[in-house]
Amino acid sequence: MLRLIKQPLFRCASSGHLMKESLVFIHQTRTFQVGKFTSNEKYNEKIEDINERSNPQWDNAGLENLLNQLQDSVEQSASDDFMGELEKKIEVENEEPPLMGTNLWPSPSSSIVGLIDRPFQVDSTVQHLVNLIMRDGKKAKAEKIVATALSIIQKETGENPIDVLKQAIAEISPLMKLVSAKRFNKSVEFPMPLKERQRRRIALQWILGECKSSSPKRLSDRIVKEIIAIRSKTSNCFKKKDHLHRMCLVNRGNAPVRI
């Protein structure tokens, strides 16, 4: 009997306690939702206030004033850039042109020392001659020899020495050379055309070869003597050129035919 009576009383007490806890929980959730709703409203109001402050409403007069200021600043910067470019162009036009052609070398009456001390114009033909004269990497010495020779040529001819040198090289430069090859266990020679640099190299080698057997002591004087001999058609370089061309004509039958 005691067990039967205690059990329903325990159940009623436990059920009443659960109902009380559930009511308290519901009340707390409602108050939390109401507080959350109010806090969300305050947050939205703050966001709207910040947006209004960061994005102020411009009236038409303010916008026009701002656009005018921007346009004036752009026009001023563009005008400054244009004036700067114009001043640069004027400075470039007013600069003196570099020494070219006949202005490269001084008059024949001037001294040789001043010409040797200053660097002469870089020309492919002159540099080729300097490189062929150079020994043991002493390029400054070779440049001094060539500059002295060119200054003497100018004094004797009264013309631009570089043009005189190029003309002399063009007169003695060959058009072809002989190349040897083996055919059927037999060495034959056949002509091959030369490029411009190859022709110039052979001509300069012939000039320097003739300078070895000349009488003047200085190499610059011997170069001048050989170039003047080429201008007067009395140099042995013409004989070398004619002999090479004659041998090329004799061996023209051995030239390979390429289809």
Swiss-Prot record:
Localization per record: Mitochondrion
Transmembrane segments: none
Protein name: Small ribosomal subunit protein uS7m
GO molecular function: mRNA binding; rRNA binding; structural constituent of ribosome
GO biological process, one term: ribosomal small subunit assembly
SUPFAM superfamilies: Ribosomal protein S7
Assembly: Component of the mitochondrial small ribosomal subunit (mt-SSU). Mature yeast 74S mitochondrial ribosomes consist of a small (37S) and a large (54S) subunit. The 37S small subunit contains a 15S ribosomal RNA (15S mt-rRNA) and at least 32 different proteins. The 54S large subunit contains a 21S rRNA (21S mt-rRNA) and at least 45 different proteins.
Keyword annotations from UniProtKB, A to Z: Mitochondrion, Phosphoprotein, Ribonucleoprotein, Ribosomal protein, Transit peptide
Sites bearing Phosphothreonine, chain numbering: 157
Gene that this sequence comes from: rsm7
Gene3D superfamilies: Ribosomal protein S7 domain
Main function: Component of the mitochondrial ribosome (mitoribosome), a dedicated translation machinery responsible for the synthesis of mitochondrial genome-encoded proteins, including at least some of the essential transmembrane subunits of the mitochondrial respiratory chain. The mitoribosomes are attached to the mitochondrial inner membrane and translation products are cotranslationally integrated into the membrane.
Keyword Transferase listed: no
Transit peptide: 1-39
GO cellular component: mitochondrial small ribosomal subunit; mitochondrion; ribosome
InterPro entries reported for this sequence: Ribosomal_uS7 (IPR000235), Ribosomal_uS7_CS (IPR020606), Ribosomal_uS7_dom (IPR023798), Ribosomal_uS7_dom_sf (IPR036823), Ribosomal_uS7m_fungi (IPR047988)
Protein family membership: Belongs to the universal ribosomal protein uS7 family.
Pfam families on file: Ribosomal_S7 (PF00177)
Classification via PANTHER family: RIBOSOMAL PROTEIN S7 (PTHR11205)
